[in-house]
Amino acid sequence: MNDIERLEKEICLALEAASDEQTLETVRIAALGKKGCISEKLKALGKMDVEERHKVGPVLNGLKNRVLELWVQKRDLLRRQAMNKRLSRETVDVTLPVRSSPLERGRIHPISQVIEEIIAIYANMGFSLAEGPDIETDYYNFTALNFPEGHPAREMHDTFFFDVDKTGERKLLRTHTSPVQIRTMEKQKAPIRIIIPGKTYRMDSDATHSPMFHQVEGLVIDKTSTIAHMMWLHETFCKAFFEVPSVKMRFRPSFFPFTEPSMEVDIQCDRSGSKVKFGEGQDWLEILGCGMVHPYVLQNVGLDPDVYQGFAWGMGIDRIAMLKYGMPDLRAFFDADLRWLDHYGFRCFDMPAFFPGLRNE
């Protein structure tokens, strides 16, 4: 028994002294391999008498199990140490250097800025936000909005159509955010007061048009809304958005399939200088389209036009951003030019504040 105790101490010391897995494996083989010292003693059990074998056998098996357990613990420890060394050696600092000023950590795109401004203004007037899919069906984009068959907007030169799918349906990229009005009226009971900012798509590209552009539409549905309410709403929005105490607006007759009567709205401005100034001057600039929701549209969503009425409007976010902040070319919005963004972009503290003294100039 003394030999077994001495052997266990020697093996334990060898395991503790092992500094790498290769040395540790050598110790294991020397103890538990086919010709290892413990294995040889286990083989010798067959030559002992029964009484002695019953005494020595459990002791050797216990030794074998303890050595194996110590070996596993030591192996796991060496592996963790090796991994930590490797991680320390291969560490790459992916963080950016500290900027000189916390205000220079990035710029907010003008479109994002203007969308937040629009949402803040209308939210202050009791409107909620609505959203819908960019890929639409013909029904929601045209039919439900009173676009008759053969309407020019259905033609390929104006609308991005997808190939016909397995069901025989031909979907498209929405040409306006008006489909969200239909989806909202189908799901939500009146009264309804929503604004719908989002991306829209049309085949057009020049200095003031883009195949993908941003639009915001609004919808009011109840039993009492009139054109007078609509006119007040547009005037209030323009004063808040362009930050002027008063504006003059004119409403010109127009045509939209989904409104009747339909109007286009011009706002008074001064274009004599390099930047458009609102609330003064003798010029007029078209700013949005609007009108009372067409009775056929109300019928398409299950509303009785003899009971319910309302108005809708829409404007290009990119366009009013250009007008407010003096950007000459719409295409630069999507060029991903950091120099342009650094010049026209906004800091986080610029979003949005409509009260004197709160702007971070």
From Swiss-Prot:
<dbReference type="Pfam" id="PF02912">
    <property type="entry name" value="Phe_tRNA-synt_N"/>
</dbReference>
<dbReference type="InterPro" id="IPR002319">
    <property type="entry name" value="Phenylalanyl-tRNA_Synthase"/>
</dbReference>
<keyword id="KW-0067">ATP-binding</keyword>
<dbReference type="GO" id="GO:0000287">
    <property type="term" value="F:magnesium ion binding"/>
</dbReference>
<dbReference type="Pfam" id="PF01409">
    <property type="entry name" value="tRNA-synt_2d"/>
</dbReference>
<keyword id="KW-0547">Nucleotide-binding</keyword>
<dbReference type="GO" id="GO:0006432">
    <property type="term" value="P:phenylalanyl-tRNA aminoacylation"/>
</dbReference>
<keyword id="KW-0479">Metal-binding</keyword>
<dbReference type="InterPro" id="IPR004188">
    <property type="entry name" value="Phe-tRNA_ligase_II_N"/>
</dbReference>
<dbReference type="InterPro" id="IPR022911">
    <property type="entry name" value="Phe_tRNA_ligase_alpha1_bac"/>
</dbReference>
<dbReference type="GO" id="GO:0005737">
    <property type="term" value="C:cytoplasm"/>
</dbReference>
<keyword id="KW-0648">Protein biosynthesis</keyword>
<dbReference type="GO" id="GO:0004826">
    <property type="term" value="F:phenylalanine-tRNA ligase activity"/>
</dbReference>
<dbReference type="InterPro" id="IPR045864">
    <property type="entry name" value="aa-tRNA-synth_II/BPL/LPL"/>
</dbReference>
<dbReference type="InterPro" id="IPR006195">
    <property type="entry name" value="aa-tRNA-synth_II"/>
</dbReference>
<keyword id="KW-0460">Magnesium</keyword>
<comment type="subunit">
    <text>Tetramer of two alpha and two beta subunits.</text>
</comment>
<dbReference type="GO" id="GO:0005524">
    <property type="term" value="F:ATP binding"/>
</dbReference>
<feature type="binding site">
    <location>
        <position position="260"/>
    </location>
    <ligand>
        <name>Mg(2+)</name>
    </ligand>
</feature>
<comment type="similarity">
    <text>Belongs to the class-II aminoacyl-tRNA synthetase family. Phe-tRNA synthetase alpha subunit type 1 subfamily.</text>
</comment>
<keyword id="KW-0030">Aminoacyl-tRNA synthetase</keyword>
<dbReference type="InterPro" id="IPR004529">
    <property type="entry name" value="Phe-tRNA-synth_IIc_asu"/>
</dbReference>
<dbReference type="InterPro" id="IPR010978">
    <property type="entry name" value="tRNA-bd_arm"/>
</dbReference>
<dbReference type="GO" id="GO:0000049">
    <property type="term" value="F:tRNA binding"/>
</dbReference>
<protein>
    <recommendedName>
        <fullName>Phenylalanine--tRNA ligase alpha subunit</fullName>
        <ecNumber>6.1.1.20</ecNumber>
    </recommendedName>
</protein>
<keyword id="KW-0963">Cytoplasm</keyword>
<keyword id="KW-0436">Ligase</keyword>
